Amino acid sequence: TYNCLYPISQAMIDEIGIDGFKAATPENIWYNGAYTCTEYIQQNTKTLTKNPLYWDTEAKLFDSVTVKMVESVDTAYQLYTTGELDHVDLSESNLTTIYNNESDPLHDQLVEKRPTKFSYQFHFNYDKHNDDQSEDTNWNTAIANEAFRKCWYYGLDLGSYYKRTNAINPYKCYNNAYTMQGLVYLSDGTEYTSLVQEKLGLPAYDGETMTRLDSEKFEEYKAQAMEELTAAGVTFPVHARYFIAGGNQTALDSANVLKQACSDSFGDDFIVLDIDSYVSSLAKEVYYLKRQSFAIAAWGADYGDPQNYLGQETDDSDNAYYMVQLG
């Protein structure tokens, strides 16, 4: 079961028992949500149909909702223009073209998305393996070095990469906390992530810069890292391997922007981003085999509390997806 099924009815527990609830199937579980999934076609569509027994009789529901699965935002955009989709995210190029042309028929349909419950982070792999499953000693030694990691923190400017998500207001994507902005507020009205900024000793978000960047500290830690790691047998540049879906041009374009950002920020003498691809399953082909140097991943809490985010980073149980899959 999942959070959409809570709170659980006591009458259901009385009827099928605790063990029966743990083993419940769609045929015997009690459910009173707005929609039921009436059709699911793998890698194609899922259809949600209005539940006539939904408890909120005043709610205005669609008769059905069809969610289409597509391989890229470019494909989705084409489906939108032909009327097959009702809304779509735009690639950087499509957004820029439409936004800068007020006569474009889609210009007045542009809406800036509200922030979701997700927060994205870089997750370093400290036990990277090569394709033959031997240990990637060069990367593992480098990423274990604190000065090397601080170079990423103080040096990596992601402004150009943020434009891939929001070309108009790219720094709205910037966040130094595990939680999304606007998730929770303190009793005095302080927004939680602004408190995190304060505790980190960083200035408040200004919407125009990445507040953690510090060129002087970056150069200091780069020199320190290269000295310490050279002594430890690491060869430079250190290659960081990053995976995207094969055949996805949008993902490749974004990865190339990230590669250039790494080059501009670190210098090709220090760190080089290598772009690789997987065929169908990022987890099975990459994460389970520990082939990635890092992953860019997001967590969205099932309830609005920072603990639910932080548990993914610090909990060593099987329920901590990040720790288990990306750790």
Please report, for each region that a protein language model flagged, where it lies by residue.
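Gly/Pro-rich hinge or "lid" segments in bacterial periplasmic/extracellular proteins
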Residues: 2-60, 64
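Append "and occasionally in soluble cytosolic enzymes with long acidic Gly/Pro-rich linkers
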Residues: 49-50, 142-264
